[in-house]
Amino acid sequence: MRNRQLTLSFPSTLYLSPVLELLLADVPAQLVPLVRLGLQEALVNAAKHGNNLDPAKAVRVHYRGGADWWCWVIEDQGAGCPECTCLHQGPEDSWESGRGLYILHQVFDQVEWCQQRQRLQLTKRLAEVDSCP
């Protein structure tokens, strides 16, 4: 498969099924449930925590993908994410909504947050499968 790009913008909502279907179109079937979980967490965070579910505020997703890698950049119009300084804490930590950030780190190979632009970049690579002789 050659590299593909897609940009989506949608009003803040928790109805994400159509958006997720478009964003997962190039992901291999065996990875779809896991990546869907991660993308759903990220999109819910952007719409709910970033944009306060304000339908006048948009969530924008830039997608790039190749044969064995996928990258999603999610932007919201909110004020930022103060708890994002603690991205590596686990779900047992006491701060609210930290579970979603923990899930992102379990699902994606790379998670980068840009506070100044309210932008989250998620990268997933297809793990090489060792073949038996």
Question: Where do the model's predicted regions map?
Answer:
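Hydrophobic alpha-helical segments and their boundary regions
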Residues: 27, 31-35, 39, 67-69, ...
